[in-house]
């Protein structure tokens, strides 16, 4: 119920318009020495203009690259100092390892959801809640498919209404141990603007596995893999 309520509120807020968004993206591409593909550009623009967005894609499709782009552009467009950026942007993940990876790629602090909500181990309660909400304005959650419905509900309770929320993950990943296939369910609800990343970039030792997974996902498996 809390999740549905928050989605409804965010969808009814006025969208943000940035006059210089296209120019700023081109400048960022130069600065980072990269060229975003069409899906990535769509993901970045949607995240900055919509109030709630889902970005989904398999391993190696550039989700972390997009998160870095969103945070940099948000800082530039809102003229935030590094200190202000750490106060306005919250990068969250279900595990410490995923949070560390987020922090390393963006140069911003990242937290596990439990830490962000100030979980009290003794009482099993969150100090950040509907009565004492978090102050951040841009919240990006990575590995969303790993979060169960109860934890996401608690997180949504602790967030203010006038925010931008970006849910990132792989909807084909194994679901959370707890209840609900939350990312898949949210995508299937069609209530949230969703951008799907289709291009595979990462080609390391696991490139065969990634390519195979991608072909199975897209139902384009060729005889070369059999």
Summary of predicted features, one role per range:
Residues 33-49:
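N-terminal pre-P-loop "Q-motif" helix
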Residues 60:
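Walker A (P-loop) phosphate-binding loop of P-loop NTPases
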Residues 66, 70:
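Hydrophobic positions on the alpha1 helix immediately C-terminal to the Walker A/P-loop
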Residues 1-21:
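Interdomain "pre-motor" coupling segment immediately N-terminal to P-loop NTPase/helicase cores
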Residues 78-93, 97-158, 199-200, 209-210, ...:
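Conserved P-loop NTPase motor core of helicases/translocases
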Residues 63:
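Conserved lysine of the Walker
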Residues 171-226:
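Conserved helicase motor core of P-loop NTPases
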Residues 49-55:
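Pre-Walker A (Motif I) flank of P-loop NTPase domains
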């Amino acid at each position: 119920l809390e999740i549905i309520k928050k989605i409804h509120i965010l969808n009814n807020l006025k969208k943000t318009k940035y006059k210089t968004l296209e120019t700023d993206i081109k400048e960022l591409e130069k600065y980072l020495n990269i060229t975003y593909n069409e899906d990535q550009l769509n993901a970045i623009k949607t995240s900055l203009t919509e109030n709630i967005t889902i970005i989904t894609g398999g391993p190696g499709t550039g989700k972390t690259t997009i998160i870095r782009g969103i945070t940099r552009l948000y800082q530039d467009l809102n003229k935030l100092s590094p200190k202000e950026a750490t106060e306005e942007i919250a990068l969250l993940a279900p595990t410490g390892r995923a949070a560390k990876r987020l922090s390393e790629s963006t140069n911003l602090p990242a937290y596990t959801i439990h830490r962000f909500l100030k979980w009290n181990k003794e009482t099993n309660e969150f100090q950040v809640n509907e009565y004492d909400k978090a102050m951040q304005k841009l919240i990006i959650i990575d590995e969303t498919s790993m979060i169960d419905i109860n934890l996401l509900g608690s997180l949504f309770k602790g967030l203010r209404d006038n925010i931008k929320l970006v849910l990132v993950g792989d909807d084909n990943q194994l679901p959370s141990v707890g209840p609900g296939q939350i990312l898949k369910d949210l995508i299937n609800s069609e209530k949230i603007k969703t951008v799907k990343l289709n291009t595979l970039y990462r080609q390391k030792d696991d490139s065969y596995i990634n390519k195979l997974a991608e072909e199975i996902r897209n139902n384009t498996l060729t005889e070369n893999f059999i």
